[in-house]
Amino acid sequence: MRQPNSLHQTEDGPKLIAIPAGWFLMGSEDGQDNERPVHRVWVDDFWLAECQVTNAEYAKFVRATGAEAPPLFNDPNFNHPQQPVVAICWFEAVRYCEWLSGLHGGSYRLPTEVEWERAARGGVAGKLFPWGDAPPESLPDYAKRWRNGPEMAGCADPNGFGLRDLCANVHEWCSDWFQGDYYGSSPERNPRGPETG
């Protein structure tokens, strides 16, 4: 394993950043019911892509496998090569990871919810966002900001781990099933989500 915050990149593959193992507080007392209770969780080290998957990266998968192109690939507000790919289902995201694994000889997969939250927090403890407790400056103009589609992948400042866009732009998929009360019964170390959902 490389040192935390180090980069790893294969030819034609995503830039990966090492997220160090550690404890953190997961959840939000001010959030939705399924984000409570806040609880202490240990996560082993793992790698995560520095930025969201771009249309250009996903297009390589579509061409190589014959997979169906996402419906917004033809929409000029969503089809710039450097915008993050949108409108793909969970199964398509999993197939993309499997394709990357075969292409680069690794074990690419979607992160678990606990891995995603640890990565998104960027090592900042006790704050609502990686930059502190204040809402994003763009919040008042949220609808206007994304009226013409998402911003280019990687345009946000990096968080404490060197990752970009995890708390802005578009949503990401996690590997876990959903269960509304899972936080109340999840294991303390490396929770993988409920068995079904």
Place the predicted regions along the sequence by residue:
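N-terminal pre-domain segments of enzymes
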Residues: 1-6
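A short glycine-rich, aromatic-capped structural motif
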Residues: 8-71, 88-91, 167-168, 175
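Functional-site microenvironments in short loops/helix caps that host divalent-cation chemistry
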Residues: 19, 25, 29-30, 68, ...
